[in-house]
Amino acid sequence: MVSPRMSGLLSQTVILALIFLPQTRPAGVFELQIHSFGPGPGPGAPRSPCSARLPCRLFFRVCLKPGLSEEAAESPCALGAALSARGPVYTEQPGAPAPDLPLPDGLLQVPFRDAWPGTFSFIIETWREELGDQIGGPAWSLLARVAGRRRLAAGGPWARDIQRAGAWELRFSYRARCEPPAVGTACTRLCRPRSAPSRCGPGLRPCAPLEDECEAPLVCRAGCSPEHGFCEQPGECRCLEGWTGPLCTVPVSTSSCLSPRGPSSATTGCLVPGPGPCDGNPCANGGSCSETPRSFECTCPRGFYGLRCEVSGVTCADGPCFNGGLCVGGADPDSAYICHCPPGFQGSNCEKRVDRCSLQPCRNGGLCLDLGHALRCRCRAGFAGPRCEHDLDDCAGRACANGGTCVEGGGAHRCSCALGFGGRDCRERADPCAARPCAHGGRCYAHFSGLVCACAPGYMGARCEFPVHPDGASALPAAPPGLRPGDPQRYLLPPALGLLVAAGVAGAALLLVHVRRRGHSQDAGSRLLAGTPEPSVHALPDALNNLRTQEGSGDGPSSSVDWNRPEDVDPQGIYVISAPSIYAREVATPLFPPLHTGRAGQRQHLLFPYPSSILSVK
């Protein structure tokens, strides 16, 4: 246990140590003067700060922070904080009007040791100390808190301000001043008289660079041009833009220099390129930047001020928010305002319309409509939903008549109709020959699977579109080298393809014979498959599709054949009468049953029920 004598000796030692410790002088002091605190204007103002009509007294706390943001008072006060003394005791008088409350005497002073930032945030709290018969002593409670951000240069005059917190109103003044030997708007330059002795002891280096500018200006190098040169240290000569040389008397030749900025080059006499203080335009809110010999200067537009035009002097009373924006704050020119924009607008003053449709929120080709308060999508047919995200079934509840098939797509149903029917729902009778598809006078015949053209003499093709002998020459391919025009092998196909076609013909013939179950079809099939020489497959000869020619090559009998009127066949059918080999040609589907057998000794004509090659076997 420490004795009273030892305790007193320890206290004296601590006090002496604190006295003789080296004290760091502050760069400056922020001073706050409270003028009045009381009920604000308007209805509902309180009559007394004291609760239950007990006596109370007020005191104030200030917290300073650098930067542009107003922060909570509980966070660290980077620039410092101060607490005032207690004010006079106040007791409410019944029936008396609410007066301004008695305030503590003196200033609230916040010393700062670093450079003054220029732009700062403040939080001022008003506390109430109740002096009734509380158990445990007085009780403290927060009565009001105001905050703001300001632009303030050190060394300037007092600035006045009014802030309201709920029903209370606070009027105050503030300033920032430098403590000698610090000078300047940021208290960063040190100044001492020329005759002042050194602050440091013998053999010690200077504590900080001192500038002799209190009594006399700096003395530059002898002969330094006063118009084109300047100095920041005694005995130097630094040139302004466009001038060079030891004394800044030589103009820079712009014809051979890359940039008129930076230190001069001893070899070329030009200025070496370097970054400038206005590069990137440090001035905000549309301010214009101009370089000075030592830094830059911003010329701010109307309504803004500050070193970089970062502080707005416009208040909510000026109506700065457009398009129905709500203005908050900005009670005086030194406080900032904030615009809360309605949906569809953005910007510091709600001056920019948000193009929400540029994000293409509507799917499946829907049309985006920005109504300001809401976004709407106009969907294409066949789609639904807030963003047209649902694909509707176009064929639901819709049927196509007469065997038609519903095809979905394009936001509407479409019917693919069977042959002979048309219209939206296949309810209308349609004639495939109504459009006259057969060219050059050909006759059109309707069929259950399509249409067939009977061509006029001299034309051929599915639609009679090809002349048989254009300009006196055959329209069929020319004979291969080494073959004569009349040679039966003139249009001979490759052997492998011929075998493949022959096998296909035989299989198709057997299948048709079995399906139709005609008694004479077996004999015809036997004659086709038995006793027939190795067939060869050829391209069509000149006698093709409506060409009259003479058949008789080989050992068979010669007869005149009319290709427009085949024997023993309905005139609507189209056939190819064979030579001693198998010929192939793509033609339209015939009109009648798939097999026709002629009389004994005559040729058999094989007709297929689907679009295919019409073949005949001798």
UniProtKB/Swiss-Prot annotation:
InterPro entries (alphabetical): EGF-like_Ca-bd_dom, EGF-like_CS, EGF-like_dom, Growth_fac_rcpt_cys_sf, Notch_Cell-Fate_Det, Notch_ligand_N
User: How this protein is processed and modified after translation, per its record?
Assistant: Ubiquitinated by MIB (MIB1 or MIB2), leading to its endocytosis and subsequent degradation.
Cite a GO CC annotation.
plasma membrane
What is a single molecular function from GO for this protein? calcium ion binding
Residue ranges occupied by any EGF-like domain in the UniProt entry: 216-249, 274-310, 312-351, 353-389, 391-427, 429-465
Q: Which cysteines are joined by disulfide bonds?
A: C220-C231, C224-C237, C239-C248, C278-C289, C283-C298, C300-C309, C316-C327, C321-C339, C341-C350, C357-C368, C362-C377, C379-C388, C395-C406, C400-C415, C417-C426, C433-C444, C438-C453, C455-C464
Q: Which PANTHER family match?
A: CRUMBS FAMILY MEMBER (PTHR24049), DROSOPHILA CRUMBS HOMOLOG (PTHR24049:SF22)
Summarize the protein's role: Inhibits primary neurogenesis. May be required to divert neurons along a specific differentiation pathway. Plays a role in the formation of somite boundaries during segmentation of the paraxial mesoderm.
Q: What is this protein called?
A: Delta-like protein 3
Q: From which source organism is this entry?
A: Homo sapiens (Human)
